[in-house]
């Protein structure tokens, strides 16, 4: 139920072992459940949460209010963090989640450093930000390009990264003539944003 659907994710037994391992070392373990759930997912997620509740994870990271409701019903003592996929871009949004009992908000990747500072200074909610990683052509993963072109839902963890495919230019009166667009000597990912890199700004953060 995370947006890393193709990753080698942990089984519930492995999560149990991982919880013991990290807690013995004074660390924390979070579970990511940040898909935008449809009704067809909620019954399976409910069963998953009931089994997950047997393992004392430190927090779950979510984006969907419905998933928050499920976690509250099944794992009421587990902290909830809001994923960057929820697109929290202002102080009022951070405060809204805080009033729902959320402990931390991972702010939207589209914010400037000044905006991050302003929200962090004026909200009671703990904040977190990404400093490295891919940027979506849309606001934090709210993209339908993958669904349209590959029938793979980005918001369900199955993004085909269509924005990074190799594209050519076609003029409508010459449908069989493809004009190359070259950016880096190999191919052009004209719909792909530059990767996020805030390493130089870590001291300011």
Regions found by a protein language model. Give the residues of each.
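Active-site pocket-lining/capping segments in soluble small-molecule metabolic enzymes
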Residues: 1-88, 106-110, 114-205
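Conserved nucleotide-cofactor-binding alpha/beta core module
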Residues: 91-92
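As written
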Residues: 101-102
């Amino acid at each position: 139920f995370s947006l890393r659907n193709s990753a080698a994710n942990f089984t519930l037994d492995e999560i149990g072992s991982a919880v013991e391992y990290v807690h013995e070392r004074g660390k924390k373990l979070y579970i990511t459940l940040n898909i935008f759930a449809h009704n067809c997912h909620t019954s399976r997620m409910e069963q998953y949460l009931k089994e997950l509740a047997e393992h004392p994870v430190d927090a779950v990271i979510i984006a969907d209010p419905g998933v928050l409701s499920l976690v509250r019903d099944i794992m009421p003592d587990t902290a909830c963090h809001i994923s960057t996929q929820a697109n929290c871009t202002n102080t009022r949004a951070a405060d809204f989640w805080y009033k729902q009992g959320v402990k931390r908000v991972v702010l939207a990747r589209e914010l400037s450093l000044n905006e991050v500072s302003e929200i962090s200074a004026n909200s009671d909610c703990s904040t977190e930000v990404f400093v490295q990683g891919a940027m979506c052509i849309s606001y934090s993963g709210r993209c339908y390009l993958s669904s349209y072109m590959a029938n793979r839902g980005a918001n369900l963890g199955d993004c085909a990264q269509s924005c990074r495919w190799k594209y050519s230019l076609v003029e409508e009166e010459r449908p069989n003539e493809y004009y190359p667009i070259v950016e880096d000597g190999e191919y052009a990912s004209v719909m792909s944003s530059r990767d996020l890199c805030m390493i130089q700004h870590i001291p300011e953060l």
